[in-house]
Amino acid sequence: MSRLRVYRESDPTRADEYTTLEDIARVAAEAQIRFERWSAERPLPPGAAQEQVLEAYAGPVKQLSEACGFVTADVVSVSPGTPNHPELRRKFLDEHIHTEDEARFFVEGRGLFCIHHGERVLSFLVEKGDLISVPAGTRHWFDMGPEPSFTCIRWFSDPKGWVAEHTGSDIASRFPRLEA
């Protein structure tokens, strides 16, 4: 079940928690974050290739691309069998920004998408069917957990795809992580 925990930047031990789609979307919107629940029921073979995932979700990919001006989409899929998953986890765990909007739709699995907004940290447990989109310049990080298992579609305005600018902050290390 999707969940949002909102922490004060200065206190990673206490949070307000939201579990309904309506509450999560409302609190997210207050921080200029888009959170929606989409259908993720298209059949995919185990270990589906990027082309298979994008083809299965061609309609939603095209619709969001046209609505938001995205020019490319890719698929990231990580499992415990992915040889470099510890390095991938570390790569996404540091707080960073993008110079473009970022959107992710979880086709399978789950992850912890954290937004550093003002003096708060919004920690979204995103799961199959969740779409989260953040505007350019939003400080954030993503935790796939020690035993990752997810597939998500990512949209970009820049044809180069995922390009992060790390902030140098250690804030992500002070907040709860996604555990197995």
From Swiss-Prot:
Superkingdom per UniProt: Bacteria
Sites marked May play a role in transmitting local conformational changes: 101
Amino acids binding Fe(2+): 96, 98, 102, 140
Residues carrying the site annotation May play a role in metal incorporation in vivo: 95
Pathway: Amino-acid biosynthesis; L-methionine biosynthesis via salvage pathway; L-methionine from S-methyl-5-thio-alpha-D-ribose 1-phosphate: step 5/6
Cofactor or coenzyme needed: Fe(2+); Ni(2+)
CDD domains: cupin_ARD
Catalytically driven reaction(s): 1,2-dihydroxy-5-(methylsulfanyl)pent-1-en-3-one + O2 = 3-(methylsulfanyl)propanoate + CO + formate + 2 H(+); 1,2-dihydroxy-5-(methylsulfanyl)pent-1-en-3-one + O2 = 4-methylsulfanyl-2-oxobutanoate + formate + 2 H(+)
Alphabetical keyword list: Amino-acid biosynthesis, Dioxygenase, Iron, Metal-binding, Methionine biosynthesis, Nickel, Oxidoreductase
Binding site for Ni(2+): 96, 98, 102, 140
EC number: 1.13.11.54, 1.13.11.53
InterPro entries: ARD, ARD_bac, RmlC-like_jellyroll, RmlC_Cupin_sf
Family named by the database record: Belongs to the acireductone dioxygenase (ARD) family.
Subunit and interaction comment: Monomer.
Protein name per its UniProtKB record: Acireductone dioxygenase
Organism: Sorangium cellulosum (strain So ce56) (Polyangium cellulosum (strain So ce56))
Organism phylogeny: Bacteria, Pseudomonadati, Myxococcota, Polyangia, Polyangiales
